[in-house]
Regions:
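HIT superfamily nucleotide-processing domains
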Residues: 1-160
Length: 160
C-alpha cells in the first residue's frame, strides 16, 4: 500500500498542470481519488477533520500525511473551525511521531501539485538520512516500511 498515486516511470508526485482537463477534474473534486474512494490510501487514524496516513513505501521512515476531509486546494479555503482543526492535526501527528522516533527535526511540506486535495506531509529527519542538507526529494525511490512499523505508528497515534 503506497500513500500516493504513482506518476510517470513510478515517480511519486509531479505536476499535472500541463494536462488542463485532468487538472480541472482533480481540482474540482470530480476526479479526486481521495473523494472518489471516500478516504485516502494508507489510513492509520481517522480524526474528526482529517485522516492521518502512511504506507509501506515512503520517502523516509516514520513519514505521515495528514489529509483534510474537505476537498479544498489551499488551507485558507477551509472554514475557520476546520482550518484550525487541520493545523492542530498536523501538529498532533508531528508531535506523536517525534515522541516515537526521536528524530533530530520534523519537516513539513504542502504541495498539491499532483493531488490538489489539501494534505500536509510530515517528515521526521534523522542524522545521516539520505536527504541531509536538503528537502525531501519525491523523485527518489521510496523506502520500505514494515507492517510492524506501521502498527507502531498507528498505536502511537491512537494512544491517549
Amino acid at each position: 500500500m503506497g500513500v500516493w498515486e504513482e506518476g510517470p516511470a513510478g515517480v511519486f508526485g509531479g505536476s499535472v498542470w500541463d494536462e488542463p482537463e485532468r487538472w480541472r477534474a482533480l481540482a474540482d473534486g470530480s476526479a479526486c481519488p481521495v473523494c472518489l474512494r471516500g478516504e485516502p490510501l494508507g489510513v492509520l487514524v481517522e480524526r474528526e477533520h482529517t485522516w492521518i496516513t502512511s504506507g509501506d513505501r515512503v520517502p523516509v521512515r516514520g513519514y505521515l500525511c495528514v489529509v483534510a476531509k474537505f476537498h479544498v486546494l489551499e488551507p485558507f479555503e477551509l472554514p475557520p473551525a476546520e482550518r484550525a482543526a487541520f493545523w492542530e492535526d498536523v501538529l498532533f501527528a508531528a508531535e506523536r511521531v517525534a515522541r516515537l522516533l526521536e528524530p533530530i527535526k520534523v519537516n513539513y511540506e504542502f504541495h498539491g501539485n499532483s493531488l490538489p486535495h489539501l494534505h500536509a506531509h510530515v517528515f521526521p529527519r534523522f542524522p545521516g538520512d539520505r536527504f541531509v542538507g536538503g528537502p525531501i526529494d519525491g523523485r527518489a525511490p521510496p523506502v520500505a516500511q514494515s507492517p510492524e512499523e506501521l502498527d507502531r505508528l498507528r498505536r502511537t497515534l491512537t494512544a491517549s
